[in-house]
Regions:
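Gly/Pro/Ser/Thr-rich low-complexity, intrinsically disordered segments predominantly at protein N-termini
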Residues: 1-114
Length: 114
């Protein structure tokens, strides 16, 4: 079946901003995905991993760490938010201010998905 609605990057961004209490993603085919909340154990494990990657990054100062609240615009058109993401500092610095403020148009260098 064909999708009824095709969202531009800006329309998807506005949809997410208007519905901040709902975690949304788009797959490469443009299908909207509602991401359910996680339970206590999964949330605790996710937080543990963010702390560990964050501590490593704090020591090395090689990049930027992101939580599952950050959506990345991937080259295949998908808009995804991994549980933990890390990006090399030079990739982050190459983005414009607007790209940093909205959904960064890049693939993280490292992700963890629980």
């Amino acid at each position: 079946l064909d999708s009824i609605i095709h969202l531009t990057d800006e329309q998807f961004y506005q949809l997410c901003m208007a519905n901040k209490d709902v975690n949304l993603e788009l797959n490469a085919e443009g299908e909207l995905i509602i991401v359910p909340p996680v339970g206590g154990e999964s949330g605790r494990n996710e937080a543990d991993l963010i702390i560990k990657v964050g501590n490593w990054n704090y020591q090395t100062k090689l990049g930027i760490v992101f939580s599952s609240s950050t959506i990345f615009r991937l080259p295949n058109g998908a808009k995804r938010s991994p549980d933990v993401a890390w990006i090399k500092l030079e990739k982050w610095q190459a983005l414009t201010e607007e790209e940093r403020e909205k959904f960064p148009p890049l693939t993280p260098d490292f992700v963890i998905e629980l």
